[in-house]
A protein has these predicted regions:
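Extended acidic/polar, glycine-enriched regions
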Residues: 1-53, 58
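Generic hydrophobic, helix-prone segments enriched in Leu/Val/Ile
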Residues: 21-23, 88, 231, 274
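A generic structural signal for solvent-exposed, polar alpha-helical segments
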Residues: 40, 131, 295-298
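Catalytic cores of extracellular degradative/oxidative enzymes
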Residues: 45-240, 245-251
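Pan-zinc metallopeptidase signature
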Residues: 236-300
Length: 300
């Protein structure tokens, strides 16, 4: 197996500093890993992965740590790993831009996002502060060009978005609110339009006075395609149209500053989202959210 040493400290403390750890090894072999910030070259990567003997090989970027099956890296990434891990770093940083973390990262935390592949038939998932992929799912997005031209960046960006959706992860919205982040990644990549249902479905929803979501917590009943469109419409208006280019960063800061937010009933959290969004926009957005069903009572 692989040995990982976690070093946690208060980065604001005067004595917080990098330390060196020596671990005497009585057996086994050093498999090595690729560090973008230290090695940077394809030649070094090729040498390291060819000499590695373990089932997994680690690629360390500036923001992302990929712990993938070595056989898949040899198959799909024999000589373009620098561009590949750089793209994953972009996925993370672009989502950080929406979250407005400049005041707390890296001053308060500097950990990487971890992504691992596993030996099972699973697809893609997120949990416990990391993202994961079934070994066969890697085939969908490991060739670098697929991240650009075949919309395959959506899957990894969607899972990374799960790590960042906490303030808007309302019951009935778990698989949709994170797509604010994956739609932003699509926009930044610049090859595809956004995902989500057309606004004609919103008109039908409004006509039938349907609520925005339900509180059953069942992803199968979640209106994911329409939900993600609402978050993106706000981005299009405030960011793309230049009305208020810091709308989402300031909104997420305000949500984070409410330390009691996740202890509130989900309905109250949604109403606070309406209030905070209006505060940040300096506009009364009640009509907008009413159109999307926020004000429609839920009896589920």
């Amino acid at each position: 197996g692989m040995l990982f040493v976690m070093y946690n400290t208060d980065l604001t403390a005067e004595n917080a500093k990098a330390i060196k750890i020596h671990i005497p090894l009585t057996s086994g072999a050093v498999s090595g890993y690729f560090d973008l910030e230290e090695t940077r070259t394809i030649a070094v990567y090729t040498e390291l992965i060819q000499k590695a003997t373990y089932e997994y090989f680690i690629i360390k970027g500036k923001e992302m740590l990929l712990n993938f099956h070595r056989i898949k890296l040899l198959q799909w990434q024999p000589n373009s790993i620098v561009e590949y891990i750089t793209m994953f770093d972009h996925f993370v940083n672009w989502q950080y831009d929406l979250l407005g973390l400049e005041d707390i990262r890296p001053t308060l935390f500097n950990n990487h996002v971890n992504g691992s592949s596993v030996n099972d038939d699973s697809y893609m998932w997120a949990g416990n502060g990391q993202i994961g992929f079934g070994i066969n799912a890697l085939d969908e997005f490991m060739p670098t060009e697929k991240l650009y031209i075949e919309r395959r960046c959506w899957g990894p960006a969607h899972e990374i978005g799960h790590l960042h959706q906490g303030a808007i992860a309302w019951t009935g919205c778990f698989e949709s609110s994170n797509n604010l982040f994956s739609n932003y990644v699509l926009y930044k990549v610049g090859r595809e339009c956004s995902n989500g249902a057309p606004l004609s479905e919103l008109a039908d929803r409004k006509l039938n006075n349907r609520p925005f979501g339900n509180f059953l917590g069942n992803p199968k009943t979640e209106d994911m395609e329409l939900h993600m469109r609402m978050y993106w419409q706000l981005w299009l208006y405030f960011h793309r149209c230049g009305i208020k280019s810091d709308f989402y960063p300031e909104l997420f800061k305000k949500l984070r500053n409410n330390r009691n937010l996740n202890n509130l009933p989900v309905g109250e959290r949604q109403m606070l989202f309406v209030k905070y969004a209006s505060d940040i926009a300096q506009k009364n957005l009640a009509d907008f959210f009413d159109t999307w069903g926020f004000m429609t009572p839920i009896d589920e």
